């Protein structure tokens, strides 16, 4: 194994790389979601919300859920209980973040809907 190969996997155990990538994406989504909730609920400044990037955010969250699901399936094939619990937790967190983002988007659409 060359030194580049070791750097590429960051010395994680096999199968954990997908779960860690999903965890990193979860933290990014959490930051964007917290900013949007703050702009929507606290300061009511809707121009700073991430409406222009909704498609990218939803697609990124679906990719994150897919990576977490693949990491969870790989963890189920191993005998490590900690890895299984960690992977399932990341999968559940990503799924919850997806539905929270979806609810916030629909809430914002209903709030901004013009009534004549």
UniProtKB/Swiss-Prot annotation:
Extracellular compartment ranges equal: 39-51, 108-116
Q: Which domain of life is it from?
A: Eukaryota
Q: What subcellular locations does the record give?
A: Cell projection, Cilium, Flagellum membrane
TM segment ranges? 17-38, 52-72, 85-107
How does it sit in the bilayer? Answer: Multi-pass membrane protein
Q: Which GO terms describe its cellular component?
A: CatSper complex; motile cilium
Sorted alphabetically, the keyword list is:
Cell membrane, Cell projection, Cilium, Flagellum, Membrane, Transmembrane, Transmembrane helix
Residue spans, topological domain Cytoplasmic:
1-16, 73-84
Task: Please describe what this protein does.
Answer: Auxiliary component of the CatSper complex, a complex involved in sperm cell hyperactivation.
Assembly, per entry: Component of the CatSper complex or CatSpermasome composed of the core pore-forming members CATSPER1, CATSPER2, CATSPER3 and CATSPER4 as well as auxiliary members CATSPERB, CATSPERG, CATSPERD, CATSPERE, CATSPERZ, C2CD6/CATSPERT, SLCO6C1, TMEM249, TMEM262 and EFCAB9. HSPA1 may be an additional auxiliary complex member. The core complex members CATSPER1, CATSPER2, CATSPER3 and CATSPER4 form a heterotetrameric channel.
Identify this protein by name.
Answer: Cation channel sperm-associated auxiliary subunit TMEM262
